[in-house]
Amino acid sequence: MLRLAAELLLLLGLLLLTLHITVLRGSPDSSSNSSHSLIQNEPSSDSFSFNPSDRQEYLDEATRRAFPKHRLMTSGHTSLQRDGTGSFLLDLPNFPDLSKVDINGQNPNIQVTIEVVDGPDSEPENEMQKENMPSWPVPSPDWRSWWQRSATLPRMNYGDQDYKYDSTTEDSNFLNPLGGRNRQVPSHRTFDTKEQPEYDYVDGEGDWSSWSVCSVTCGSGNQKRTRTCGYACTATESRTCDMPNCPGIEDTFRTAATEVSLLAGNEDFNATKLFGVDTDSCERWMNCKSEFLKKYMHKVANDLPSCPCSYPTEVAYSTAEIYDRIKRKDFRWKDASGPKEKLEIYKPTARYCIRSMLSLESTTLAAQHCCFDDSMQLITRGKGAGTPNLISVEFSAELHYKVDILPWIMCKGDWSRYNEVRPPNNGQKCTENPSEDDYLKQFQEAREF
């Protein structure tokens, strides 16, 4: 039985070999293809012959050369090697064994290329570049700049660049301590010069925008400008702006100044008569209670805002509006913690002070003066408490000195007597500060001095 099967296979092989030779002889390209023929090595191309051993070598050579490796097509299947347009060869000895093929597995010999073309006029070079480009998006320059800024942002120095306190004097506040406190203070910059201030920002940030329009059309207001400082970050800088005096305010101030001149009892304001050097000038000042002074003090009490219970940090940067819940309107305030107001002399226990600003609605030239301790709490009594100024330094520094500062000097720094005439404001009923024990101690020291 096995012998019969072997003979059948042998006959089948001979049949296929005969068919193979017949196809080779009948191919029109066999004579022109040197890789599939051995005729090129013969001296003559008209005829050829070979013995049985040569015949076997010829068949082996033809089998090896007539079937190159299968080419891979983009359509996903393998094509058979063709010798011509009308014939094909079936390479049974090299035909792969399909009995153990996994139909569900992926074919590693299949390559698929997906190409996206924008238009019919796209050039081949562009198509090749698209095939070789990575699939992830390329970061934009803005994103790269933000990354560089974010990486270096913790190293930025904000001490000399943000929120410049606008002042033409060497004033200071809680962001800019006094020089006597052994702290290194950055130099102030004024906005009166045309030269732009220098900043220590890292490269890559946007330019400063132009200054905004002044917040008021007359009087004193503020301006702002911004710049980008990274992702979802905007730096803001502000400064004060002084516009022309509002219409009618000159008449208001002139009338008030005339009334202030009556504080001495005559129309010619004479501070020498009011604060004459005698045995007890403080007592004389305390007993000066004219009818006009009473009316003026009543106007001051009704016109001025109440002191806030804690230091409003927004005034440290520039003039700020703060809502007064008792008067039910906004008042403008300015920091008054610097040497210009002589804080360390007249209010020795105060750390910060603020002063209200004049407005067109003001019926007097007075200003509210409030002082705070190291914890930013309002000082309601004692030698560090702020007292109302009958003449605001904003209107006249000279008159302010004569009306508000000289009485303190005449009383030789006895705040207990001074505060009897100019009581500190606590209209918002803030917690009494300092404590009762500290207050009594300060009071006793003032009497003994």
From Swiss-Prot:
Source organism: Xenopus laevis
Residues in AMOP domain copies: 274-437
Glycosylation sites: 33, 270
Gene3D superfamilies cross-referenced by the UniProt entry: Thrombospondin type-1 (TSP1) repeat
Pfam family, one: AMOP
Region spans: Disordered: 27-55
One example of a Gene Ontology biological process annotation: negative regulation of angiogenesis
Compartmental location: Secreted
Ranges annotated as biased composition (Low complexity): 27-53
Function field: May act as an angiogenesis inhibitor.
InterPro entries: AMOP_dom, Angio_Inhib/Adhesion_GPCR, TSP1_rpt, TSP1_rpt_sf
Family named by the database record: Belongs to the isthmin family.
Domain TSP type-1: residue ranges: 203-247
Main location: secreted
Key word Signal present: yes
Lineage: Eukaryota, Metazoa, Chordata, Craniata, Vertebrata
Name of the protein in its database record: Isthmin
Domain remarks in the Swiss-Prot or TrEMBL record: The C-terminal AMOP domain plays an important role in the anti-angiogenic function of ISM1.
GO cellular component, one term: extracellular region
First and last residue of the signal peptide: 1-26
Keywords: Disulfide bond, Glycoprotein, Secreted, Signal
Disulfide bonds: 214-241, 218-246, 229-233
